[in-house]
Amino acid sequence: MKNSKKVIASVLSLSMGLGLFAGASLIGNKKAEAVNPIVQDVYTADPAPMVCSDGKVYVYTSHDEDVTVNNFFSMNDWKCYSTTDMVNWTDHGTVLSWHEFDKWAKDNSSWACQCVERNGKFYMYVPINAKNGTTAIGVAVSDSPTGPFTDPLGEPLVGPAPNYIDPTVWVDKDGQAYLYWGNPDLYCAKLNEDMISYDKDLNEDGFVKGIKRWDLETNDFKELAGITNEGGRIADGSYADDVSDACRQAQSEFGVGVRVDNNKVRRPTLYEEGPWFYGRNGHYYMVYAANGIPERIDYSMSDSPLGPWEYKGIILEENMEDGKGTGSFTNHAGVIDYKGHSYIFYHTGKLPGGGGYKRSVAVEEITYNEDGTINTAPMTADGVEAVEGLNPYQRVEAETIAYGKDVEKEDRYKGDDTNNQDRNLCDISNGDYIQIKNVDFTNYGAVAFEAMTSSDVTKGETAGHIELHLDAVDGEMLADYVVKGSGSFDTWTSDKVDIDKSKATGEHDLFMVFKGDADKEELFKFDYWQFTQMELPATPTPTPTSVPTATPVVTPAATSAPVQTAAASPQAKAPAKVKAPAKVKLSKVKAGKGKITLKLKKIKSAAGYRIAYSTNKNFRKAVKMIVTKKNTVTIKKLKRRKTYYVRAQAYVNNSGRKVYGNYGTTVKVKVR
């Protein structure tokens, strides 16, 4: 959100007065917990994930403006975020806007997009309102997944026509690319190899002038006009016994619609909008927003990329894991496989000030059965686990975060080239912070921290501080990095601070807490950071000592002294890199009066264990630790009738240092 601090403050003030957001997880206070939504500073929706050839996942989103126009969707551009670990997301900013299509498109209608990679180029398909008042799908092309994207056609790829929205593209193994779209009907075109055209002369296999259509509107089936909800027969789906063969076929493909509107059938099928088409292990999937309003995510499967489809069921329900609504009456999903896991992206209205017209992207892990069907997944506030640790010993952009409290980001152009841009954190004020998850300091640890910053404070004077904390906002402090003034926000400077190498080892969540003059709106800007790893001792080459020639000594026994040989010099050995222990399982947890007793499942390789406990489920504050060699531990002096969160990790010893494994599952315990 642009000026999000002011927006959040006004939202919180209003919500307190109206009694809204009860129990919500709010960005603007200490209760902020969720990793879902994955972006916290702007409203994002309609996620379109892409696994790129560079090894990263890119997620393209539409962008809900902070202020709506006519109390409706206000959307003018598309954002992009990337990750290699699924928990820390790098913000690439706006990668395309409706202005690129202003020859034929109108503003305030940058709906759900999708980007695909082919032959070294990236093709972004976007739906926009056309100047004639209907909708159309355009395409923009780039040499980079983050743009700049340009319109090669100067006109729509398909349309304009009513309800031409929500494009989804898949390139099949045989090289044929398919474009699906539509609300509430579903359409398909076969894209040519250039990805910016389709064969308009195709008139077979259900295609007419290059487009195939699935009739899914109520007025597509005349018999539905005479069906009412008398006896609840629409709501329970039993009316499907009295429909035509054509309607029955549509319902077999996309489910029996059970929405009622003025006592009539609102939709003959469950399909509503937002198709996501892909192939996997010989199966083809159509995932879509269904059964609105509020919408959930359903799917159908086929053995062919062109159907016929078979309705399979629900992936995401209408409500969150806690039974409460998502805060958004729409939903829109994207599905990928990445590094041995499968994920579904979707959106909610869970950010402060959020709702149906101000949405936020989230992600969950999903699983498939042997027959290819998908298991229903919960929508959670916790999100997903990291698939790998983040390397802190290379440059990390400051806008790469898992969670940010009150931080903003901005574009910074290099010289006059508006296509050559960077991004940085801005509007940093006292008490703001960012969280970077699963930072892997390795067994050897960090000895220094460097940051690139700018400020309007006089050069050399203190502009603020970056406190580095482990595992919580108030966790163990690695260092207090003093941000020096650079004289101007346009002038950048870097410095280093030393770190105790014994502290920064293993894998941790890293919190960067920003401190400074509480009355100043912007302390400094922050571009990137990097740790320095402890240098391993060099292994010296043994240098033999010179061997003196033995001199015979005459003795009464007339014996000669032996020749002396040089002894080899001992080699200095670097600490051996050891394997971190496995995750710890809590085999028994018992709550007592003001205490919790834990029994940890023993790990043979472990030298001991570290137990972390807190009243904050994401361990962002008030975290306490117990290090022990025992696998049965009692945590005492706890507040009675208070809920605590407990987790444990094992460690092994390596050259006098503890090397920790990852934490096991967090357990929620209410003390008696």
Where are these regions (language model features)?
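Sec-dependent signal peptide cleavage junction
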Residues: 20-35
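Carbohydrate-active catalytic/glycan-binding domains of CAZyme proteins
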Residues: 32-480, 484-538, 570
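Short, flexible loop/turn segments at beta-strand junctions in immunoglobulin-like
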Residues: 499-503, 602, 635-639
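Short, solvent-exposed loop/turn segments at the edges of extracellular beta-sandwich modules
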Residues: 517-520, 652-658
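Ser/Thr/Gly/Pro-rich low-complexity, disordered linker/stalk segments of secreted
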Residues: 537-579
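Pro/Thr/Ser/Gly-rich low-complexity, intrinsically disordered linker/stalk tracts
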Residues: 570-605, 658-672
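Extracellular low-complexity, O-glycosylation-prone stalks/linkers
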Residues: 606-625
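Beta-strand-rich modules
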Residues: 638-656
